[in-house]
From Swiss-Prot:
Pfam families, sorted: Dabb
Gene3D superfamilies: 3.30.70.100
Domain of life of the organism encoding this protein: Bacteria
Coiled coil: none
InterPro entries: Dabb, Dimeric_a/b-barrel
PANTHER family referenced in this protein's UniProt entry, alphabetically: BLL2683 PROTEIN (PTHR37832), STRESS-RESPONSE A_B BARREL DOMAIN-CONTAINING PROTEIN (PTHR37832:SF1)
Residue ranges occupied by any Stress-response A/B barrel domain in the UniProt entry: 2-95
SMART domains cross-referenced by the UniProt entry: Dabb
Protein name: Uncharacterized protein SCO4036
Amino acid sequence: MIRHLVLFKLNDGVGRDEPRVLAGVEAFRALGGQIEDLRFWECAWNISDRPIAYDFAINSAVDDADALKRYLEHPAHQAGVALWREFATWVIADYEF
């Protein structure tokens, strides 16, 4: 199994309640039911007020590297990425477990 983690940081001046952000969140929340290769899927807003914290997180799992590739290339995932690219940056980590 491969764990796929993503941490998002909203760009300066961007708020969680902006329509484009809400659309991005909904697009990612829906992925768990849209992409068959996902074995585990959760995403949520950060609840910590620590200055080093990121704003939004995705925690997911797939069977193997091929499944991860299919997930990353899936049109629904690509559509969500296109939305988030407009208002955030992110870091990722993928590891076997």
